[in-house]
Amino acid sequence: MTGSLASNYASWKQLQEIYDKDRAKIVLRDLFAADPQRFSKLSATYNSQSGPGVQILLDYSKHLVTEPILQKLFNLLREAKVEDARDKMFSGEHINTSEDRAVLHVALRNFNDFSIKEEGVDEVSKVLQHMKEFSESVRSGQWKGYTGKTINTIVNIGIGGSDLGPVMVTEALKPFSKRDLNAHFVSNIDGTHIAETLRLCDPERTLFIVASKTFTTQETITNAESARDWFLGFAKDKAHVAKHFVALSTNTSAVTAFGISEANMFQFWDWVGGRYSLWSAIGLSIALVIGFDNFEKLLRGAHAMDQHFKTTPLEKNLPAIMAALGIWCNDFYGAQTLALLPYDQYLHKFADYFQQGDMESNGKFITKNGDRVNYQTGPIIWGASGTNGQHSFYQLIHQGTKIIPADFMAPATSHNPIANSKHHRILLSNFFAQPEALAFGKTEEEVRKELGQNASEALVKSKVFEGNRPSSSLMFDKLDPATLGALIALYEHKIFVQGVVWGINSFDQMGVELGKVLAKQILAQLDKSDDVKGHDSSVRHLPFILQVDHC
């Protein structure tokens, strides 16, 4: 990973020349009309080579590209040494240069196919076995609370990757869940979050999972302490904490001081980034909800995508293709966002999850060499499940002044084929219709023909869709653990490839730190009666205008 400015690559300059010269000719209506085989040329199918069978179809024929442009994009990836960077990641080299760390979420789901040398890698299987034994004891009813009752509620207390991943996966895999085991997730430091969650809990039957690598994360530990205080209000004896609290951490002394048994502490390592941690002990809540066998299928699905990414030529490599298309939209067409639009209600947290996954990874303006970039890096990630989004923000995507690339995704088969699959057929008809409408739009001539000669000019103009809005479509058979694992790994690797091309470090998150440091300074001053010192005039006075409670 060179850290070079992408704009210095010869292929980048060639792509800029193509964009400047040929942009007006890149019209999807014309491209489809000129080539009846465009779909077959600009689509790719992924078939897992190991683990549970997974097939994913990627249709990128509705992107603003031609085959020559695609080849230039792949040249760019090769010039940026993406394949070399990929191999370094998989081998355990310290590609997180700012923190001098390996980046080894792939090791958490490695089933002896990759040779990885890094401290802690050999311990992964032991932690997975610990997770299996614990989750099965809770799910079977063998694990009892302090009054001898079984557990029927789990509360995961974490923030960032310790929350977003488990929330997304447990929602996505709800059809595989233990329905009599309720799962809640508390992340926000706002006391409302923990207070409202505790109202749903029975202290005799609730298990709290405290997810913090250092066991010092302010939001997580504050919430955990409040949960412990609530619990002890009923249980009275601190010894009972050990039956109702477990920790996902590496800080043994802090965990045991809290009252959690060391035997109920699940380890992970500093080469696991928070936004890639659902594959680790952070996934304990997932294993509890869907069962360890299904958690393992999730891992195997991701591992098979890892194999695809590591061994498949770029031209047929789904993460590489999606990364290249994103760079073309982002850096040449000037698109600033990417909408993730799953036509599956179970995936309603998918965009939220990859907001962190993408924006925390590639929201950087400095290369690994210390240069300020002169191009756009990571896009803004957002989205919602279809068809909900159609009735809120699709208006702007279709007729707004911004280019918003979109990734549509849908299962061919529903888990809930109610009304003889009527719901699913309607859902899929919208899934197929939206990319077509975005690509081809509706001309003024077509509108006039539809409305007739008596239609007002204002009405005619308002019904014109310019089209030429880029999108990808991802289809898979049915959303199951292995398929979800493959989808997550697909996007992880796409993000990685883009970071390599842009020359940035996708694996630190320094932008999270400054606000946290200032907040700690202000918090210390809020406990005093005098002015908040050392900050700008609005910060100095707002706490007093808001009458901050010092009690």
From Swiss-Prot:
It comes from the Eukaryota. Keywords: Cytoplasm, Gluconeogenesis, Glycolysis, Isomerase. GO terms for biological process: gluconeogenesis; glucose 6-phosphate metabolic process; glycolytic process. Homodimer. This is Glucose-6-phosphate isomerase. Its main location: cytoplasm. In the cytoplasm, catalyzes the conversion of glucose-6-phosphate to fructose-6-phosphate, the second step in glycolysis, and the reverse reaction during gluconeogenesis. PANTHER family: GLUCOSE-6-PHOSPHATE ISOMERASE. One of its GO terms (cellular component) is cytosol. It holds the Pfam family PGI. It catalyses: alpha-D-glucose 6-phosphate = beta-D-fructose 6-phosphate. It is found in: Cytoplasm, Cytosol. Belongs to the GPI family. Its EC number is 5.3.1.9. GO terms for molecular function: carbohydrate derivative binding; glucose-6-phosphate isomerase activity; monosaccharide binding. The keyword Isomerase applies. PROSITE patterns: P_GLUCOSE_ISOMERASE_1 (PS00765), P_GLUCOSE_ISOMERASE_2 (PS00174), P_GLUCOSE_ISOMERASE_3 (PS51463). Pathway: Carbohydrate degradation; glycolysis; D-glyceraldehyde 3-phosphate and glycerone phosphate from D-glucose: step 2/4. It comes from Agaricus bisporus (White button mushroom). The keyword Acetylation does not apply. The gene is gpi1. D-glucose 6-phosphate binds at residues 161-162, 212-217, 356, 360, 391, 516. The active site is at 360 (proton donor), 391, 516.
